[in-house]
Every structure is written in C-alpha cells, then in structure tokens.
Amino acid sequence: MIRRPPRSTPKPSSAASDVYKRQADSIVINPHKWLLTNFDCSAHFVKDPEALVRTLTILPEYLKNNESENIIDYRDWSIPLGRRFRALKLWFVIRYYGVEGLQEIIRKHIKLASQVEEWINRSGNFELVTPRSLSLINFRFLPEQNGKFLDIDELNLKLLNELNDSRSVYFTQNRVRGDFVIRWSIGQTNTELRHVEDAWIQVQKIASSLN
C-alpha cells in the first residue's frame, strides 16, 4: 500500500547569501527558469564592470557618437553588438510580484524540495545521492536485493522511463560519480504541496511494480 506522506514544515534555506556573492567575480542567472519570466532571459552581475568593458569593447568610427563617452553602452558588456529587448518582460515581473513576492515563490519551492528530501531519507528503499541543492534533488531507487542481483542503473532508467511515460510527472536523468540517478527539480510557478505529494506517490507506486 502506498501511503500519502505525512506533512511537515522544514525551514527553507538558500545559498544566495552575501557570503557566497562576495566570493564570486560574476554571477549569471536565468530568470526564465525560476523568476516567472518567459523564455529567454538571462541576467549578468559583475563585481568589476570596467574589467568586462575593457575586455569586450570595440569602438570603430562608425559606432561613435556624441554620447559615446557619457553613457553606459551595453553592447560593450557582451560579444554581440545587438540583442533583443529582454529587460522589459523581467521588469514587468518584478513590478508585479515585487522582491518579496518572488522570494516567497522561491522559498516555497525550496521548502517543497526539503519535504521531498525528508520523504526519500525516510523511505528505506530510495537513496538521496547528493545533498539537496535549493529545489534540486538527485535520487535513485535502491531496493533490498534479497540475494538476487539487480542492475541498479538499469532499474532506475526503467523507473524514469515509466514515470515519464505516465504523463502525470516528468523527471530528467543525471549521473553522479558514474551512477545513474533521477533528477527532481521543483520550479514551476503554480506547484503546490499536493502536486509534490502526488508525484512522490507515483514514484513509489511505479518503483514497487518494478521490484
């Protein structure tokens, strides 16, 4: 019998703290992945913008104008001279949700992933292959072999394929230290606890049918 997992409220955590930011010279994020922005949109933060501009700037005569020395020209911040106007859609998202609204969504997803992490650790026949990273989990089905040989990689590949073929959930694959694992990423805007619970029940149900 597959039981609905008990609910708990683990405290969410985030690696995006000032401690980590100070260790980086540049940070690139994709708002189209976790900030509710339509594809495509990337944001680039640099500690020393002048170093980036010195590296990439070109100024032939035909690009000069009266304001060349007085403005920030973002063509000097990347290899292509031109780009689509991606900033406006991100601006609208930030204006609508605000920083606190976006933080709330991200923290909710991290909290949901923390719940999944707890279920996996308590399951007995699933293994958390790496520590959870924000809302990303790498896990695999690791049942008791009871004297019979099991190809764990092949078993998890079959589990992944059957989960995705069910069309009720979708996972991706990964390899960690050579082992085949299933990659569970929580980041869809409208994901709620009930969706994650249903996904976990589906994982257990299909895994039980394979063992």
Short names for language-model regions:
Residues V176-N211:
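PLP-dependent enzyme catalytic core of the Aspartate aminotransferase-like
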Residues E127-R132, F171-V176:
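Short beta-strand
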Residues M1-A16, Y20:
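Single conserved hydrophobic/aromatic residue that forms the stacking wall/gate
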Residues L128-L163:
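Conserved PLP-binding catalytic core of the aspartate aminotransferase-like
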Residues L163-Y170, Q204-L210:
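A common structural junction motif
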Residues K33, Y96-V99, P143-Q145, Q188-E192:
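A generic structural motif
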Residues R22-N121:
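Active-site C-terminal subdomain of aminotransferase-like
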Residues F92-V93, N138-P143, I182-I186:
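Short, hydrophobic beta-strand segments
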